[in-house]
Amino acid sequence: MGGPLTAAGGRGDGGAKAVEPLRPPPPPDPKTMARWYQLEALERAVRGNTLAFLETGSGKTLIAVMLLRAYAHRVRRPDSRRFAVFLVPTVVLVGQQARVVEQHTDLVVKQFCGEMGVDFWDAATWRSQLEDGEVLVMTPQILLDNLRHSFFRLQDIALLIFDECHHARGNTPYACIFKEFYHPQLNSSASDPLPRIFGMSASLIYSKDLNQHNYSKQISEIENLMNSKVYTVDSESALSEYIPFASTKIVHFDDSNISSELHANILSCLNRLTKKHIEALDRKLHGSSLENAKQRISKLHRTFVYCLYNLGVWLAAKAAEVQSYEENSLSFWGETLDKNVEGFIRNYSEEVHRELSCFLKNGHIGEKFPADSQDGILTPKVHCLIRTLLQYRHMQDLRCIVFVQRVITSIVLEPLLSSIHQMSGWNVKHMAGSRPGLLSQSRKNHTEIVESFRKGKVHIIIATQILEEGLDVPSCNLVIRFDPSATVCSFIQSRGRARMENSDYLLLVGRGDVEAHTNAKKFLASGQIMREESLRLGSISCQPLENTLCEDTYYRVESTPAFDIDKASGTCTLHLPKSSPVQTVNVEGEGSILKETVCLKACQELHAIGALTDSLLPELDVPCDEEPDIVVENKIEQPSYFPEEFVDNWRSFSRLGIYYCYKISLEGCPKTASPTDILLALKCDLGSDFTSSSFKLPGGQDNASVTMKYVGIIHLNQEQVIIARRFQTTILSFLIGDDHLEVSNGIKYFHEMQVPIGVVYLLLPLVSGRIDWCSMKFSSSPIYEANNKHMTHCHSCRDIDLLQTKDGPFCRCILKNSIVCTPHNNIFYVISGFLDLDANSRLPQHDGTVVTYKDYFKTRHGLTLTFENQPLLAGSKHVKVRNFLHNYYYKKEKEPGDRYSVELPPELCRIIMSPVSANNLHIFSYVPSIMFRIQCMLLSVKLKVQLGPTVQQFDVPVLKILEALTTKKCQEEFSQESLETLGDSFLKYVTTRHLFSEYRLQHEGILTKMKKNLISNAALCQLACSSNLVGYIHAEEFNPRDWIIPCLDYDERGNKKISFLAPNGMYSQRKMSIKSKRIADSVEALIGAYLSTAGEKAAFLLMKSLGMNIEFHTEIPVERKISMKAEEFIDVRSLEGMLGYKFNDSLLLLEALTHGSYQTSGPTSCYQRLEFLGDAILDHLFTEYYYSKYPDCTPELLTDLRSASVNNNCYAHAAVKSGLNKHILHSSSELHRKMSYYLGQSFTGPSYGWEAGIGLPKVLGDVIESIAGAIYLDSKCDKEVVWRSMKRLLEPLATPETIEPDPVKGLQEFCDRRSFKITYEKNHVDGVSSVIARVKAGETTYSATKSGPCKLAKKLASKAVLKDLIAGHKDTEAAAV
């Protein structure tokens, strides 16, 4: 053990008098109260990077404070510009640790967290913070972001402290600080000092793996990552003099003995309620609200089932009660519910609470614990918790934490423990995460609870892992693990909370749970194993960090400047990389400082052209119009447009007299006795796009389609308009509505209220080409009014035989071919005629008995039939209106007589409509889908007009525009996906051309960033919003129940369903919530629609009309600064023969083959800019080729074909196969070695698929792209020339028959279908990277290990495992895979 240090960081006499009075007197030196191991750890930390691995409560923070005092002279202002950083994993720890440092040092401490808006601070703001800040306490993400933005430099930090350093793993912010900044600088030749590293943790293992053999490996990994060595003590006994250790005990509970019958009854009850409420949602909600509500009810159901099995009926009921609180408008999954959904969720929870309460016995909980457990009121585990707590009733000043796994468990245990009268003297609180949600708690709530716990006002806290680390919780005399620890770290930290003398740490374990007992023993031994392994590794130096991006090393070549110095003449020439806008710099001067002089001049020239900032840093943000500063929300709420052709004032519409008519014919549907069509009458002509048009109805029967044809104008008087209006209102209300009152109110609403403005058009049934006025006149009359006596007969009937109905006597002719409703069960029926049966006829029952119809209705419905001799009506359920645009396979329904035949007494029926033909019912059931498609087509025509005359000149079919605006979520016969793929490639192609031409001094990296900003989803979304494009997007599946019936466009409260949008002169039906990416996809799909039907000019002008500031020059001129002959460097003739193209400017071919490492005098540019251009050209060429070659392929297949052909591996394979690798100019020995290694293999076969060119250096693929760019420029931007030449190199091309699926995707799909678990593990041993793929399939584990770059090795390993799995599972599905 080392002796105490002498200097604690005090300042000297000189140079500090001006600031000395501003500082308070220094606090007492904490070393005077430090323990021996703390002083020993401090000495180790001063000498080198150290990780202090000590128990919770052993004073690790004090070691950090002493280290800060030791480093005070290095960070104190104004003598030093460096500072110390204290990193903590959670926000709550920022203020906590900052206060500790302030109490024990005289350093200026500043604290930072995300709530301060630090994400939006610029370099100037951070500089102002560092003016006087000496110790900065913050979360690690803030430091990582600042390092990435170069606001901080690692060398400016003198001391870097990591609290809870076990979080340094994977890609956490702790780990990224080391991987991205510390280790690169550690391995570089830079002389800048690195900060001293000090880490603190109570557990070095943060893993679920309890295998003791892996402890050494994990400790070594964290040491290597943090470049530090672990300091710890020999055993717990070395600390026991200073730290009280809890007595760990295992408390057993029995298995649940609740009867299986009771459990089954309760579970059945939950399932029934869940099904009931989900079915209710289908009738009341739609779209995103419906899915949202269904998901939440399903999640709640799983939560209640969890509580039932693990906690008992009482707590399951309590969980339902908590969720039913009205103020709890947020689900505990953290997503805000819309107003329509909140009520359904609360109703569901309330009903679950009522039903579960029925299973609870009367009486106070806890009066008879064994009986409660026996009856399932509480599980044995909960009973064990209560029994255990009651054993500590004698304890004075109880401080207890009960650790649970789930938030809901902590919430419901609080009222349970509070309600037990034996615990009435104890105050119980729960604590869970501060995320938004169920009974959400803020950090202020947490602080108040902990403070009450400290003062003894709260005795028991039921907490999730939030109390394992972070908050400064007082020492406890009792800690109970209700749920087992998930990791070693969790176990050690929760045990560390029991730090009082004679404290207990209790583990609740099932009596027969062997695994839990084994884990508990391993947990107990883990601390000592970690100490022993840490001490054993103490003499082993830290190893360099493994390179996790090893695949890049195969082709990455570091560009270094080259100096040509002539000491005799005093001149120096600096050669910069070929990608630099300045490539050579010449100076004359004094020999001893020639390098410095030429570098200064190079900086001046680079700064002059904007390649360096004023701070002489690379300019990564090029200020230009092409890089807008865009922030777009993930979801955008926009109005959904409605066509103005369908909107008018009903009063004025009925007086027009002249109406434009379109005949709508439904084809491919069942043949009826007298086929009918529909006549659509409108206020205006719809234009040339609707003179004659047709579209399919994939949701109907095979080959169902609609033809729409303009047939001229007709004259209608006001009475005829009213008759037609009544008819369509009645029949459509009946077909769409499923509630008698709803339909009746809708029909009455028509008569009672005149709509000032709304959806206005007429749908007139045709018979033999003529309007069926007879059917409309009588079937739309208000029969439902019982006092309408003149309607007891139809106009031509002489029959005096009246039948008694619910609304009085009616003639047989009225009842035949009518629509009736039976109020006793609220069901609609279509009446086709009369049966030779009456109330006394016999009705066979399912059980074999026979009753009369009179007895049946009396027994079943409590109805007495008084008109026994009336014939029964032959009824059937009416055809349901559904979404016939939905792209699902049509299944032929049974004939009504086979399935829906029913016998109805007339006296139980209320006539809704009569007469109504079966033909009219059938075709009008298609009307909502037909009119919605016409509505969308009208909007597509409107969009064509809105885009302006320059775009309108191109004849793009309306259905093609509609395809571009229809998302996959609509589930229709077409979607925008294929057009989006095509438009995306053209957008990249045009943007790349523009940037390549406009910014000739910028290298490929800057151009790529500019392109990304130009065509990012955020940029495209902003363009769409600015162009008022979003309202045209068809983003949700059509729901016929939401379709507006002409005339009935007010809701039940009298609110309009159609509104006028003054800013853009459009009408809106509703508001929709749409993701910004979906909007961007629609822009790309529109570009694809214009490209595929009208060509490149049309697509480009569309992009311009949307506001894209780009140009599309027919040629891109090439400038030459130096004249040279390409033949002196490459074999031009041989290459031209290989490519099938003769260059006009062979220097372009030379540039395309020149690697950035080639510093020999001659070529002035490397291939990077040409690669940037060629990449976009090839991507577009392949996409266009596959889109036109396979017009009927699915969007998924189009994407797979494109991916299989357009990737660097395929290009690299083609380059080697053709011998292009022999012509590449480079000066990198490393690249030469890698190429030689891989080129020793055989490269034949096709150049497509993921296996083509695997492992080849990236430069080989880059050359294919750069040559494509060179040919494109040389041929004056002729894509056909490029395609012919590149096709020679890349053939044979992928086809739908030859494409090979991605093995990672294939393995995932195979395992998902069987619920197999897949894991991937990366290894790096002796410089060789590998990936192990494992699949747990029942009792069998399949695994494969493959070496190589990470992505490639993962695919190879997946392929091998998938092959073994298929061989081991010889079923039909496996064979298909």
Swiss-Prot record:
Limits of the DRBM domain: 1302-1367
Gly residues: bias regions: 1-15
Name recorded for this polypeptide: Endoribonuclease Dicer homolog 2b
Keyword Nucleotidyltransferase appears in the UniProt entry: no
Keywords associated with the record: ATP-binding, Endonuclease, Helicase, Hydrolase, Magnesium, Manganese, Metal-binding, Nuclease, Nucleotide-binding, Nucleus, Repeat, RNA-binding, RNA-mediated gene silencing
Region (Disordered): 1-30
Coiled coil regions, renumbered to chain: none
Cofactor(s) demanded: Mg(2+); Mn(2+)
Organism: Oryza sativa subsp. japonica (Rice)
Residue intervals of the PAZ domain: 798-913
Assembly with partners or alone: May interact with ARGONAUTE1 or PINHEAD through their common PAZ domains.
Enzyme Commission code: 3.1.26.-
All residue ranges annotated as the Helicase ATP-binding domain in the record: 41-222
Record function comment: Probably involved in the RNA silencing pathway. May cleave double-stranded RNA to produce short 21-24 nucleotides (nt) RNAs which target the selective destruction of complementary RNAs.
Primary location group: nucleus
Record bears the keyword Hydrolase: yes
Covalent S-S links between cysteines: none
Record-listed ATP binding positions: L54, E55, T56, G57, S58, G59, K60, T61
Domain of life: Eukaryota
